[in-house]
Amino acid sequence: VSSGGPITQDNTGVEYYATLFAVDESPIQEGLIWVGSDDGLIHLTKDGGNTWENVTPKKMPEWMMINSIDASSFDTGTAYIAGTRYKLGDFTPYLYMTEDYGKNWKLITSGIESEHFTRVVRSDKVNKNILYAGTETGMYISFDKGNSWNKFQKNLPIVPITDLTIKDNSLIVATQGRSIWILDDLTVLHQLSQSTDEAKLYKPKDSYRMRGG
């Protein structure tokens, strides 16, 4: 078809496809850039865009919209992607991880409910095992690089999470229609393990008392 792919009921004009929807450069290797498109393709360049390689997961369903890409702050070959197919009637969550520059990908959605389709995934900047995922119906967290996920809703409203970012060790959450939320200071999360059977003391970040006058 002239649109380049399936026609949906979306009226934003994005179904002409071949449009880059997500871009992220490695924070630890200059010129290593990941891009994802609205027709389900992922490409990687290691030389600042001079040459590109198609590294799309072989088993990923076609016509996936790549909503977000997150390049690891620890390993140059590691990246995470979140994709959606809800416009095609598929509400399945799709999160993938690679640790070898896209040669092999692993689906990492265990623990996320079957119709909570995923809009964004971000990796922690301090603890390489912690991941955050935003779905159509709220937040999830993983303490084992995506092998398992737990709901992380707290006092967030049940609302689509459209983007996540970490700034000054705080998690900033963008929602669709319910403002921006901030989880201040991730220090305690960095000290959590997957599970614990005994009491544990957590070290908070340093605080300062200031005198006025």
Language-model regions, residue ranges each:
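Beta-propeller blade termini and top-face loops
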Residues: V1-R211
